[in-house]
């Protein structure tokens, strides 16, 4: 497997590197800069998938690019540096055996100072405080409405069952139909008293003054919201 011809890249990529100090790209005593946190070949930022690896010339590149540059020279695996063309031997062709660039890894290990954005905190606290009781009241009203709808649905099913019994019983037990009708009339009266004549319920058949006030108030609230 012959080495691929890699075009010589200009040395201006890292102006800190000198022939006497090729590790100047590490950022000096102040640590690596933002430009040193990405590979000079693929321009991808270093990460756990693309760890920075040092060649024999102390130039660092990501492990993915080094795997692509890996070739055989003199029956041995080696990688030519894209910057200075110096060949680095890789035992067994394993790029993971190369040394990591510790300064860059330490920089990546330190979490950045990020400010979490909370959109709910941008709103007016007074508005949120005033909106919480209203939301609680709306949820309670929705729960009551749901329960009332379920009760009405049950009453409709019971009435349907009563009608079926009235239609079937005269053909089966002609003498018992009188008592059954009396029982059904009593049950219907109880249901009517429960669902229509209770003064404390907002969803009853007889509207209370409070219910009328709420119904008159809803369109104005909708208009103010829109």
UniProtKB/Swiss-Prot annotation:
Catalytic activity: S-ubiquitinyl-[E2 ubiquitin-conjugating enzyme]-L-cysteine + [acceptor protein]-L-lysine = [E2 ubiquitin-conjugating enzyme]-L-cysteine + N(6)-ubiquitinyl-[acceptor protein]-L-lysine
Domain notes: The RING-type domain is required for ubiquitination.
Pfam families: zf-RING_5
Statement: the UniProt record of this protein carries the keyword Lipoprotein: no
The protein's enzyme class: transferase
EC number: 2.3.2.27
Protein name as it appears in the record: E3 ubiquitin-protein ligase RNF186
Keywords: Endoplasmic reticulum, Membrane, Metal-binding, Transferase, Transmembrane, Transmembrane helix, Ubl conjugation, Zinc, Zinc-finger
Post-translational modification: Polyubiquitinated. 'Lys-29' autoubiquitination leads to proteasomal degradation.
Residue span of region Disordered: 121-143
GO cellular component terms listed in the entry, alphabetical order: endoplasmic reticulum membrane
Subunit-structure text: Interacts with BNIP1.
Pathway: Protein modification; protein ubiquitination
Major place of residence: endoplasmic reticulum
Membrane topology of the entry: Multi-pass membrane protein
Regions that span the bilayer: 157-177, 179-199
Localisation: Endoplasmic reticulum membrane
Function: E3 ubiquitin protein ligase that is part of an apoptotic signaling pathway activated by endoplasmic reticulum stress. Stimulates the expression of proteins specific of the unfolded protein response (UPR), ubiquitinates BNIP1 and regulates its localization to the mitochondrion and induces calcium release from the endoplasmic reticulum that ultimately leads to cell apoptosis. Plays a role in the maintenance of intestinal homeostasis and clearance of enteric pathogens.
Zinc finger (RING-type): 39-85
UniProt GO BP: intrinsic apoptotic signaling pathway in response to endoplasmic reticulum stress; proteasome-mediated ubiquitin-dependent protein catabolic process; protein autoubiquitination; protein K29-linked ubiquitination; protein K63-linked ubiquitination; protein localization to mitochondrion
């Amino acid at each position: 497997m012959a080495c691929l011809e890699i075009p010589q890249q200009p040395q201006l990529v890292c102006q800190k590197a000198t022939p006497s100090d090729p590790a100047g790209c590490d950022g000096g005593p102040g640590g690596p800069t933002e430009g040193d946190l990405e590979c000079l070949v693929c321009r991808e930022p270093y990460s756990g998938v693309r760890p920075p690896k040092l060649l024999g010339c102390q130039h660092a590149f990501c492990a993915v690019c080094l795997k692509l540059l890996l070739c055989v020279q003199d029956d041995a695996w080696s990688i030519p540096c894209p910057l200075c063309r110096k060949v680095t031997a890789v035992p067994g062709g394993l790029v993971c055996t190369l040394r990591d660039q510790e300064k860059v890894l330490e920089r990546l290990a330190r979490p950045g100072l990020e400010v979490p954005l909370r959109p709910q905190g941008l709103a007016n606290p007074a508005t949120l405080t005033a909106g919480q009781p209203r939301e609680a009241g709306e949820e309670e009203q929705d729960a009551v409405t749901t329960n009332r709808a379920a009760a009405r649905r049950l009453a409709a099913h019971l009435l349907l069952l009563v009608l079926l019994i009235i239609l079937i019983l005269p053909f089966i037990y002609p003498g018992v139909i009188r008592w059954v009708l009396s029982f059904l009339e009593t049950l219907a009266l109880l249901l009517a008293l429960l669902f229509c004549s209770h003064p404390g319920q907002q969803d009853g058949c007889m509207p209370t003054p409070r219910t009328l006030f709420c119904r008159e108030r809803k369109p104005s609230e909708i208009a103010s919201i829109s």
